[in-house]
Swiss-Prot record:
Biological process, per Gene Ontology: translation
Disulfide bond entries: none
Keyword Disulfide bond found: no
Protein name: Large ribosomal subunit protein bL17
PROSITE patterns in the cross-refs: RIBOSOMAL_L17
Gene coding for it: rplQ
Quaternary structure and interacting proteins, as annotated: Part of the 50S ribosomal subunit. Contacts protein L32.
Cellular-component GO terms for this entry: cytosolic large ribosomal subunit
Biological source species: Geobacillus stearothermophilus (Bacillus stearothermophilus)
């Protein structure tokens, strides 16, 4: 199979990736395990590509996946609006490769390999 199960059932895995994708859109940089980051990379690339398309169908597809969380409390902008108005225009000239994964040390406690995933 071409994906990682991350020790979860299908619904738990989808919920985890939705949460991580929403957090990455809001914060533009998160710290997580290497396996989660590699799975998240594929999801977030698709979301940014939808944002670049920018039509109504792309917006609805992204809205079905991204959680409805406030990205900026001062302006009241939510994660979906941030994706389509702030993040996607940045990558208009770039064909993929919107994220960077930088390795950190192992996590204290269980030794899981930790990384920082961020938008380029």
């Amino acid at each position: 199979m071409s994906y990682r199960k991350l020790g979860r059932t299908t619904s738990q895995r989808k919920a985890l990736l939705r949460d991580l994708a929403t957090d990455l859109i809001i914060n533009e940089r998160i710290e997580t395990t290497e396996a989660r980051a590699k799975e998240l990379r594929a999801v977030i690339e698709k979301m940014i590509t939808l944002g670049k398309r920018g039509d109504l169908h792309a917006r609805r597809q992204a809205a079905a996946f991204i959680r409805k969380e406030v990205a900026n409390s001062e302006t009241g902008q939510d994660a979906l609006q941030k994706l389509f108005s702030d993040i996607a225009p940045r990558y208009q000239d770039r064909q993929g490769g919107y994220t960077r994964i930088m390795k950190l040390g192992p996590r204290r406690g269980d030794g899981a390999p930790m990384v920082i995933i961020e938008l380029v």
